[in-house]
A protein has these predicted regions:
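Disordered inhibitory propeptide/activation segment of secreted metzincin zinc metalloprotease zymogens
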Residues: 2-82, 188-193
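Acidic helix-start/capping segments at beta-turn-to-alpha-helix junctions
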Residues: 70-75, 105-121
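A short alpha-helix/helix-coil micro-patch that ends at or immediately precedes a cysteine
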Residues: 71, 78-103, 225
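Second-shell loop/turn segments in exported
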Residues: 72-83, 146-153, 157, 206-211
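Catalytic zinc-binding patch centered on the HExxH motif and its immediate surroundings
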Residues: 83, 114-140
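Surface-exposed patches in mature extracellular/periplasmic domains of secreted proteins
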Residues: 97-110, 174-181, 232-233
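The catalytic-center signature of Zn2+-dependent metalloproteases
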Residues: 155-156, 161-217
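Short, low-complexity, Pro/Ser/Thr/Gly-rich segments in the mature regions of secreted, periplasmic
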Residues: 213-233
Length: 233
């Protein structure tokens, strides 16, 4: 017997309004288990939407700086698929440009990378947004997007994909996002960056792109949000 549908039309509409106020496009928003999926690859936990006002959510939206974040690939993903190598290279990008410290650890990581058949999803992967200063806990690789995503994507393409999804785990939105939400609490432009950047790794619909480095403005954004601590005497 199927589990009864728990969300009323009113609750769903309220969730859409809250998510829109965060600056996210809800045009094709869908429900998946305990999550809402927006902009194809962003996972938002239902409980965090239902229990947190938009202003509170915005205030705790990005992860706190100077914390150690563990990332690991689920042990159900074969070693031969080089997702682990791609993950290690992806976290090196954030270690290079931010005050955050990423460590690869497959034992109970804060961010777990797994695979699932995300039917009807038009994205290579999906990353969960953060809450209360902590990173989103999931990156789900869409095993049904290509016939065999493990062999279809090169190591460089996997690295690009994971750098992008880790950005969502930290609270980064799509660089080419579709505008600001209600009351000025939505899509916030990072100081020193333009309104568009064709080279940004946080542009949407970039699955299949190869890694060519962070753009100049990607680096500005990372250093602005999570600056490294510089000690001078």
């Amino acid at each position: 017997m199927e589990e009864p549908f728990k969300d009323s039309a009113l609750e769903l509409e309220q969730a859409k309004l809250a998510i829109y106020a965060m600056g996210l496009d809800t045009t094709f928003m869908v429900e998946w288990n305990n999550y809402y999926i927006v902009e194809e690859d962003i996972l938002l936990c239902k409980d965090s939407i239902n229990l947190t006002s938009t202003r509170q959510y915005h205030a705790t939206y990005y992860v706190d700086n100077y914390q150690t974040i563990t990332v690991g690939v689920d042990n159900t993903i074969a070693q031969s698929t080089n997702w682990r190598e791609a993950t290690k290279e992806a976290i090196d990008v954030y270690n290079k440009y931010t005050g955050l410290r990423f460590v690869y650890n497959e034992y109970n990581p804060q961010i777990k990378i797994s695979k699932s058949n995300l039917y009807n999803a038009i994205a290579c992967a999906q990353g969960e947004f953060p809450l209360s200063g902590k990173p989103g806990s999931k990156i789900i690789i869409n095993d049904s997007f290509y016939k065999n995503i493990d062999t279809f994507l090169s190591l460089s393409q996997k690295k690009f994909l994971l750098v992008h999804e880790l950005g969502h785990n930290l609270g980064l939105r799509h660089t080419n996002g579709l505008g600001e939400g209600d009351g000025g609490v939505g899509l916030v432009q990072i100081p020193g960056t333009p309104t568009s950047d064709s080279q940004s790794f946080m542009n949407s619909t970039t699955c299949g792109n190869s890694w060519n480095g962070a753009s100049t403005y990607d680096v500005v954004a990372l250093k602005t949000l999570w600056p490294k601590c510089i000690i001078s005497f």
